[in-house]
């Protein structure tokens, strides 16, 4: 999937996400925030200027969010995004209200919307995790010019192709073709292989 497709999934399939910010003491604070719109430039949501959430966004300019869709653990997909945010003001409010008409029940008049403002998550990275597939499926993505940092586990040149890693992998995502190769798109990142030093 493309980054835009992940964003669309967040907005259309998950919508209400758990967002983490940091308070003035450096402690984490979470709240549930609806992701209301996505385009090629990021994710968009709104908040009111009187909220502590607004102050944390303005103070730190960064957030992390997670959301999941599914009835239970083995039938769910989850997406996490972390990145820089910026306030873009009220210009997009009409679009966000058009795309999310339930907001008219919360803020029914123009006057009641005076304190609302839109934020954009414009640069960062994310992860996709799908436990409904066998083996599991995972992916990572970046947007807004963020650097793509390699994560997970990789086989080193010290691998002697003994095959001992094959039984330790809970998702059977290791292939032995000369030396072991981990299929990153199916890896749980459990750490089992780091214990056998491949």
Please place each PLM-identified region on the residue numbering:
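Short beta-strand segments
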Residues: 15-49, 55-57, 63-69, 76-81
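Flexible glycine-rich active-site/ligand-binding loops centered on an Asp-His dyad
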Residues: 118, 133-150
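A short, cysteine/histidine-rich metal-binding "knuckle" motif
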Residues: 164, 192
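Conserved small/polar residues in nucleotide/adenosyl-binding loops
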Residues: 196-198
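Ferredoxin-like iron-sulfur electron-transfer modules
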Residues: 143-161, 172-189
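Extreme N-terminal tail/first-helix region
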Residues: 1-18
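Short, structured beta-strand-loop surface elements
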Residues: 52-125
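Intrinsically disordered, low-complexity linkers and tails
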Residues: 123-130, 134, 151
């Amino acid at each position: 999937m493309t980054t835009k497709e992940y964003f669309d999934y967040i907005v259309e399939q998950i919508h209400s996400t758990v967002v983490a910010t940091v308070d003035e003491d450096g402690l984490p604070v979470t709240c549930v925030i609806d992701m209301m719109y996505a385009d090629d430039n990021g994710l968009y949501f709104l908040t009111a200027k009187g909220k502590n959430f607004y102050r944390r966004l303005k103070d730190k300019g960064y957030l992390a969010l997670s959301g999941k869709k599914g009835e239970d653990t083995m039938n769910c997909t989850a997406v996490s995004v972390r990145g820089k945010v910026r306030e873009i003001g009220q210009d997009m409010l009409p679009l966000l209200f058009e795309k999310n008409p339930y907001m008219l029940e919360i803020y029914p008049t123009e006057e009641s919307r005076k304190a609302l403002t839109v934020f954009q998550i414009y640069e960062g990275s994310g992860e996709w995790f799908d436990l409904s597939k066998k083996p599991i499926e995972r992916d990572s993505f970046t947007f807004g010019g963020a650097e793509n940092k390699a994560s997970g586990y990789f086989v080193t040149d010290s691998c002697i192709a003994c095959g001992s890693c094959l039984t330790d992998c809970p998702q059977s995502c290791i292939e032995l073709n000369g030396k072991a190769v981990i299929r990153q798109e199916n890896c749980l990142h459990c750490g089992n292989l780091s214990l056998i030093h491949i």
